[in-house]
Amino acid sequence: MQREGFSENTVKAFLSDLRILTQYVGAGTAVRNISTNDLNHFVDWLANERGIPCNPKSLARRITTLKVFFGWLVESSVLLKDAAEPVVHKPVMTPLPTILSDTEFDAVLQVAQTLRRAEKPDARPYLLLTLLLHTGIKKSECMNIVLNHIDTSNPEQPFLWIRYSNPRRRHKERKLRLPVWWPETLAEYREQHQIHDTLFPCTARNLEYVLRNVADLTDLSKGLSFELLRWTCVVRDHRDGMPDDRLRQKLGISKITWREVRLKILRLTSPVL
């Protein structure tokens, strides 16, 4: 987990979950002797008999720990059979994220284009919106972009490199396609705002004000946020047929996190009955 860049808190939680399992089955029990029945009883004990409250989110995480641990033992040829695979995993679903409808999508871009072509033109709203809607990057990733992360050497296919200075986050680094017309907007923005190094040399709150202004001008009651635009990008990419693993990599998330994200995508894109 450390090699793959998981956070210190994630590693600590994983080890803590395994320690609880060890206490339950007994420190002298060989892992090959732990059965699916043992694990199901362990999950029931956590939920109902341990005497220490275990909320649904913690229980779901501990079941995930079992599946990851035993799955890894099978992949490493330590075990022949995955005892955790049949254990029922009911992920705890947080509320569905808010996204833009197709009509709202077109409306906010039209407002941003109007600002771009105004008497006192400002390309920043359009640049920011299109960047987020086409790449799905997070707020922190957006704030860390410097100009040399943007590759426009091939006019037919510009790219954005998402970089991390923290070695533990290097697994999140990725190369994302940008629209072919986006560098033109970038050039306008750079000239207007005298940008030479950091793409957005301001605070994140300042960019949130930019998004809020566009939402107000569009009469968009749900507002605009980095998270809303990220999820809008995700849902549109899924709807356009992007394969699951490619979409997961585009978002820079782990396979474990992807499980819940995918369920939310399916719920957001399923027809209303």
Where are these regions (language model features)?
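A short, glycine-centered helix-capping/turn motif at helix boundaries
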Residues: S77, L131-N144, D240-M242, L251
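Conserved tyrosine-mediated DNA breakage-rejoining catalytic core shared by Y-recombinases
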Residues: N144-W182
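Basic, Lys/Arg- and aromatic-enriched nucleic-acid-binding interface segment
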Residues: A107-K139
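N-terminal core-binding DNA-recognition domain of tyrosine recombinases/integrases
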Residues: M1-L96, L115
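Active-site/catalytic core of tyrosine-dependent DNA strand-transfer enzymes
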Residues: R177-S221
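Alpha-helix N-cap/helix-start motif at helix boundaries, enriched for small hydrophobics
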Residues: V11, L66, L128-L129, G136, ...
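Short, basic (Lys/Arg/His-rich) helix/loop patches that form interaction surfaces
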Residues: R117, R212-Q249, I253-S254, R267-L273
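DNA breakage-rejoining catalytic core of tyrosine-based enzymes
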Residues: L79, V92-L109, R169-V180
